[in-house]
Design a protein with these regions (language model features):
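Structured adenosyl-cofactor binding patch, chiefly the S-adenosyl-L-methionine
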Residues: 123-163
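Non-catalytic positions within long, well-ordered alpha-helices that form the structural scaffold/packing
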Residues: 28-31, 130-131
């Protein structure tokens, strides 16, 4: 683990299985402690194969010599997630006003990175996320990235800022 600070990550409910497996594996290797699947407005498949994902995080934890295995939470709505979490929220949205990575400010709260759904966030979701206390909207690249690339990039940026 790169830091003792607890890190979390939000992922959308479902992407193609092999891409999701890769994303979960790499995020585990990079130190994510918890996966929080969110059901967005444009989520098509609302179920995850939790057993399969748990197997992936165990294998990735062993491969990277992690002492702890990340947990995989049950899918939840965006509203439910925002209401019950006290976090530093990093919103990776190419369409909103963003800060530069070097301006990212993190507190002692857990960090949660929101990576959007394939069809992008709805305006309603974007507004809801941007109104969350403690949210920081960060552009991680000039180009629109595939989800698995965005996850690796965003986690690497957070690891850099934390350490």
């Amino acid at each position: 683990v790169l830091s003792r600070r607890q890190r979390q990550m939000c992922i959308r409910d479902r992407i193609k299985s092999n891409y999701q497996n890769f994303m979960i594996q790499k995020a585990t290797e990079l130190g994510v402690t918890k996966f929080l699947p969110i059901i967005f407005d444009r989520t098509v498949v609302r179920k995850i194969n939790k057993e399969r994902l748990e197997k992936i995080v165990i294998e990735a934890s062993e491969q990277s010599n992690r002492m702890n295995v990340p947990s995989i939470e049950n899918p939840q709505t965006l509203d439910g997630f925002l209401k019950k979490n006290s976090i530093d929220l990093i919103f990776t949205d190419i369409n909103s006003n963003t800060i530069k990575v070097d301006k990212l400010k993190l507190t002692d709260k857990p960090v949660c990175i929101i990576i959007g759904p394939e069809g992008d966030f709805s305006e309603h979701e974007r507004d809801k996320i941007l109104s969350f206390k403690g949210v920081q909207s960060v552009k991680i690249n000039e180009n629109i990235l595939r989800s698995e690339t965005a996850v690796i990039s965003a986690i690497s940026i957070v690891n850099y800022v934390i350490n």
